[in-house]
């Protein structure tokens, strides 16, 4: 498997302050681990069952790199800051060449 695209969909946000602190820590942690942000924010349009909820799309060199970043100390510190302030769904897709 080659490059991987990570899609994170925020199902709900219950604490904006925790989310802000998480984002402050997560962005540099993800970039330092090799993640490249392709898009993030509220969708500009949705169709069918789509919802206007925060979505993040990140490119990784491999699934292993993405998983190592998630498990790494810097990102785990960001997760502790989030502390239940949001419910999210993570998906990993093999990138098309």
Language-model region placement:
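Short S/T/G/P-rich N-terminal loop/turn motif that feeds into the first structured element of a domain
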Residues: 1-54, 61-71, 94-97
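C-terminal structural segments of small proteins and small subunits
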Residues: 66-91
């Amino acid at each position: 498997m080659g490059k991987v695209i990570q899609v994170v969909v925020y199902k709900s946000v219950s604490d904006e302050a925790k989310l802000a602190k998480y984002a402050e820590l997560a962005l540099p942690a993800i970039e330092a681990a090799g993640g490249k942000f392709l898009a993030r924010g509220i969708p500009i349009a949705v169709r069918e069952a789509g919802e206007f909820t925060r979505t993040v799309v990140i490119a990784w060199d491999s699934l292993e790199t993405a998983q190592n970043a998630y498990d790494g100390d810097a990102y785990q510190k960001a997760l502790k800051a989030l502390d239940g302030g949001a419910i999210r769904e993570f998906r990993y897709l093999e990138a098309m060449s």
